[in-house]
Amino acid sequence: MNKEEFINKIHGGLIISCQALPGEPLYTEEGGIMPLMAKAAQEAGATGLRANSVRDIKQIKKVVDLPMIGIIKRDYPPEKPYITPTMKEVDELMETGVEVIALDCTLRPRHDGKTVAEFIKEIKAKYPNQLLMADTSNFEEAKNAYEAGVDFVGTTLSGYTEESPKTDHPDFDLIKALVDDGLPVIAEGKIHTPEQLKQVIDINPAGIVVGGAITRPLQIAKTFTSVFEK
């Protein structure tokens, strides 16, 4: 799938992120839960999916036929980047046939010692036809990654790094600035409500991802139980 085909598939609809990490209620060693989430997302009308780990991506692809953004979350302390942070994770994801690979493109120190531009160029040299998405937290990071060769820039990490504003809502200003600059934007991060989604739609990015507000029942339940604590 090329870039234009991917945009045609996901634009005007919703990419739903289906993830569960160790320690979360929906995580199991053998998997099997995220494919059910993905089926529910597809039945609800999702136009794409975002998933974590080779296991989950392969299991989802067996039951759902939607374009997918794939990542591997792996910590390399003390460095902070953990979303597809090295070529090892890229190599593993390539075995899944996932349509887009997303990777941390913040300007924080990396485990492999490379710059973001060096990492992107290395991936593109090894896998020239693979679509890449930059997970970033601010305008500078997104612009840097796009100029280095990624196909899409995401606002995934805005609000989660020291280099971005701390808010509990989508970074509308960042999404708009990137769209206005002509970049192919996948808006993601802190979209908690349909009203916030509508605001993002009005900015008209190439794609939009919603995750926790749909597929993390612990997070969803807490929004209700916390009412009793106020």
UniProtKB/Swiss-Prot annotation:
<dbReference type="GO" id="GO:0006053">
    <property type="term" value="P:N-acetylmannosamine catabolic process"/>
</dbReference>
<comment type="pathway">
    <text>Amino-sugar metabolism; N-acetylneuraminate degradation; D-fructose 6-phosphate from N-acetylneuraminate: step 3/5.</text>
</comment>
<keyword id="KW-0119">Carbohydrate metabolism</keyword>
<protein>
    <recommendedName>
        <fullName>Putative N-acetylmannosamine-6-phosphate 2-epimerase</fullName>
        <ecNumber>5.1.3.9</ecNumber>
    </recommendedName>
</protein>
<dbReference type="Pfam" id="PF04131">
    <property type="entry name" value="NanE"/>
</dbReference>
<comment type="function">
    <text>Converts N-acetylmannosamine-6-phosphate (ManNAc-6-P) to N-acetylglucosamine-6-phosphate (GlcNAc-6-P).</text>
</comment>
<dbReference type="GO" id="GO:0047465">
    <property type="term" value="F:N-acylglucosamine-6-phosphate 2-epimerase activity"/>
</dbReference>
<dbReference type="GO" id="GO:0019262">
    <property type="term" value="P:N-acetylneuraminate catabolic process"/>
</dbReference>
<comment type="similarity">
    <text>Belongs to the NanE family.</text>
</comment>
<dbReference type="InterPro" id="IPR013785">
    <property type="entry name" value="Aldolase_TIM"/>
</dbReference>
<dbReference type="InterPro" id="IPR007260">
    <property type="entry name" value="NanE"/>
</dbReference>
<dbReference type="GO" id="GO:0005829">
    <property type="term" value="C:cytosol"/>
</dbReference>
<keyword id="KW-0413">Isomerase</keyword>
<dbReference type="InterPro" id="IPR011060">
    <property type="entry name" value="RibuloseP-bd_barrel"/>
</dbReference>
<dbReference type="GO" id="GO:0005975">
    <property type="term" value="P:carbohydrate metabolic process"/>
</dbReference>
